[in-house]
Design a protein with these regions (language model features):
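Short glycine/serine/threonine/alanine-rich loop segments
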Residues: 92, 139-140, 192
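Conserved PLP-binding active-site segment in aminotransferase class I/II-type PLP enzymes
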Residues: 1-100, 107-110, 188
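Active-site region of PLP-dependent enzymes
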Residues: 4-24, 31, 201-207, 214-268
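Conserved PLP-anchoring active-site segment centered on the Schiff-base-forming lysine
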Residues: 106-161, 167-169
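Hydrophobic alpha-helical segments that mediate membrane insertion or helix-helix packing
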Residues: 86, 104, 120-121, 134, ...
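Small-residue (primarily alanine) positions within well-ordered alpha-helices
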Residues: 95, 104, 108, 139, ...
Length: 268
């Protein structure tokens, strides 16, 4: 056995690294032209199409800015740039990029404590993903009637609250922002978390506050059919560090990537 292989120090302490580099490229499952034929169906501009083709033809997928968040050695990946953009635009402390608005909702509901037997009050009208994400988090959606705006009616919420209720999930529908003042008043009175579904109202405001920054967590979709379209993707915003870390654990399949991975937890 070589002297290197008998090294007792951890890589962190200067010992042998388990992986020092990646050689070669895997064969893609589909060709660039086939991918572009699919992308073309979304009706994107020629500039957007050219940008997507440049990414698809790049040789830096594994170690470049597009897929690598942790091992590329870059100061900022494309996902991290997207998260930074979300923080800057909406003034939130934390942001988490996901593969869809539904995934953002799943992360959010798990973060606020939804689980087996726990209930989340959702609007009776809206996209199915809101309630589906509650079920995905092992919770039970309870449907609340809507008012003339077609958004959740704050006056109808209290009758639905039980000892199992942990959160409200107002959905800002078709660009219309919910009555967040009324919804937040009920949530504060009963000690409930609020997860805003902003998939259809990105940029909408309630007074001086952006939709998605009023409750505990805001969840956005950037699919090709949304107000801000990016092909497919989602974004979670919050000002609560603990909620962000819990949501990030879901996104990372149970991992917890702190800025310093070896730091002690910052909460009890």
């Amino acid at each position: 056995m070589s002297e290197q292989r008998t090294e007792q120090r951890l890589a962190l302490q200067g010992g042998l690294k388990a992986v020092s580099g990646v050689e070669g490229h895997g064969k893609p499952k589909i060709g660039v032209d086939e991918l572009m034929a699919v992308v073309e169906r979304f009706g994107l501009s020629s500039d957007a199409m050219a940008g997507i083709r440049d990414i698809a033809e790049a040789d830096t997928w594994g170690g470049g800015p597009f897929l690598a968040n942790y091992y590329s050695g870059l100061d900022e990946s494309k996902v991290q740039a997207f998260e930074r953009c979300g923080r800057e635009i909406f003034g939130s402390t934390y942001a988490l990029g996901t593969n869809s608005g539904t995934a953002a909702l799943h992360c959010a509901f798990t973060a606020v404590g939804v689980g087996p037997g726990k209930e989340v009050i959702c609007p009776a009208i809206g996209f199915f993903a809101t309630a589906a994400a509650v079920v995905q988090a092992k919770g039970i959606p309870v449907f609340c009637d809507v008012d003339q705006s077609l958004c959740m009616d704050p006056a109808k919420i209290e009758a639905l609250i039980t000892p199992r209720t942990v959160a409200l999930a107002p959905t800002h529908l078709r660009g219309v922002v919910c009555d967040m003042d009324g919804i937040m008043a009920v949530a504060r009175k009963h000690g409930l978390r609020v997860v805003e579904d902003v998939a259809q109202a990105c940029g909408g405001r309630c007074g001086d506050e952006y939709a998605g920054t009023i409750g505990d967590v805001g969840c956005f979709s950037i699919s090709a059919y949304k107000i801000v379209g990016g092909g497919e993707g989602g974004l979670l915003l919050t000002d609560d560090e603990r909620l962000w870390e819990r949501a990030n654990q879901v996104a990372e399949c149970g991992g917890l990537w702190r800025p310093d991975r070896f730091a002690a937890p910052r909460y009890e």
